[in-house]
Amino acid sequence: MADLTTKYLGLNLKNPIVVGANNLSADQNKLKRLEEAGAAAVVYKSLFEEQIQLERAQLDEELTEFDERHPEMIKTHPDIEHSGPEEHLHNLEKAKNALTIPLVASLNAVYRETWVEYVKKIEETGVDGLELNFYHVPYSFDEDGKSIEDQQIDILREVKKNVSIPVSVKLSPFYNNLLNVIRKMDEVKINGFVLFNRFFEPEIDIEKEEHRFPFNLSSKGDYKLPLRYAGLLYNNIQGDICSSTGIFSGHDVIRMILAGADCTQVVSTIYINKFGHIGNMLSEMEKWMENKGYN
């Protein structure tokens, strides 16, 4: 049998197929099914800044709800131990204990303080690694690209100071010079780069004249941009390369590995072709290796 093992973030993977962060990965039963289907690792559904800020706002509201009442009318402030991001952390720990394959947490924050606070909490759950999802849409005409890049690199520097687990960063291709940005992040000792994330893309229903929120899946052929950057980065950075977007088949995975990637992330193909497709992808890879005489 062909040897499909690889290494990513210092983790030994049985093959190069990692399931990226998505709604499926937040369900423990589905996580087990992904593991049984052959996934080498899973990235747990992202924790977003909005969830964290919402919990804080709700807590503030709950803690002051009874301030004008007589103290004998209430017992204690509401217990929110397992709500919002706290529930996310609780479920993350449960998921880690349920799986035998590596589990990577994903965080999508905005403020520097939030990044630092929550990477510490995430590390305490026992996960094997951390993926920081940099999803930044500037709303100011005065904010230049360099200031955004400097802020992100500063965040990465602080995160690396505060955790010992391996850290990867998931980036968009929309930088002035992506290679330069990755080199600077690599100098901060980031362990891996996931290329690329998918932005939320709005739509408008012209009949109802209102916003529509389509399910934003990638398409076959979308792999060509990450393929290009896997090749450009290979042997030029210390961090690992994980290709993401448009990877639908075992042949797509092979393309990425040949270009220089250490592993790949898949999501859309799981939604479209279901969990068992991971096995089909692995079979395609094994057959290709056998035909080539590789072991």
Residue ranges of model-derived segments:
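Extended, intrinsically disordered, low-complexity segments
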Residues: 63-74, 223, 231, 283-295
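Helical hairpin unit composed of two closely spaced alpha helices linked by a short loop
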Residues: 265-269, 273
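N-terminal amphipathic alpha-helix/helix-capping segment at the start of soluble metabolic enzymes
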Residues: 1-18, 87-97
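Short, basic, glycine/proline-bearing loop/turn elements
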Residues: 12-18, 75-78, 166-167
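Alpha/beta enzyme core
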Residues: 28-68, 86-104, 108-242, 248-261
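Thr-Gly-centered strand-to-loop micro-motif
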Residues: 20-21, 220, 243-244, 266-267
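N-terminal binding-site loop/beta-alpha segment at the start of enzyme catalytic domains
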Residues: 9, 15-33
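Short acidic (Asp/Glu) and glycine-rich catalytic loops that position anionic groups and cofactors
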Residues: 259-265, 282
